[in-house]
Amino acid sequence: MTTIVTIRKGGKVVMAGDGQVSLGQTVMKGNARKVRRIGKGDVIAGFAGATADAFTLLERLEKKLEQYPGQLMRAAVELAKDWRTDKYLRNLEAMMLVADKSVTLAITGNGDVLEPEHGALAIGSGGNYALAAARALMDTDKSAEDVARRALDIAADICVYTNHNVVIETLDAEA
């Protein structure tokens, strides 16, 4: 699987993900890009789960963002509704984190659209490790990028499905 973490702190929103792609117990690739900018570059998205399924969902989210420009929450809710009710989409096995300048969200196949309480959110096989590390570091003087990078490093030290090849995307956040 993988680990994706997002941090909203100090006027920045940062999303970081590792690069490992596993097939069963085998590492197939170590430098995949699971965090990227979508839409007009004003939204960052990261995914965990089946890669083909995640790309399908990213494409759907981009279409929703075209339909609802500048409204990430609305686009995410509409995607989650489709994901939950569509017979084809319902079978997709992936999770997504998305963020823009004003909101960070987790979108799940159960139709959940979740906003973090404390400025940190993480998904994937190492998500719980990364989230715990990030929460512990949020009250320090570390920048959002430093918190994300360290949280992902800790997750990679613990989770065998997460590596240290980190991709980071950053946006300016609203105060």
Swiss-Prot record:
Top-level taxon of origin: Bacteria
EC nos: 3.4.25.2
Location of this chain's protein in the cell: Cytoplasm
GO molecular function terms attached to this record: metal ion binding; threonine-type endopeptidase activity
Protein's UniProt keywords contain Hydrolase: yes
Gene Ontology CC entries for this record: HslUV protease complex; proteasome core complex
GO BP term, pick one: proteolysis involved in protein catabolic process
Extent of the signal sequence: none
Reactions it catalyzes: ATP-dependent cleavage of peptide bonds with broad specificity
Biological function: Protease subunit of a proteasome-like degradation complex believed to be a general protein degrading machinery.
Family: Belongs to the peptidase T1B family. HslV subfamily.
Protein name, entry field: ATP-dependent protease subunit HslV
Organism: Rhizobium rhizogenes (strain K84 / ATCC BAA-868) (Agrobacterium radiobacter)
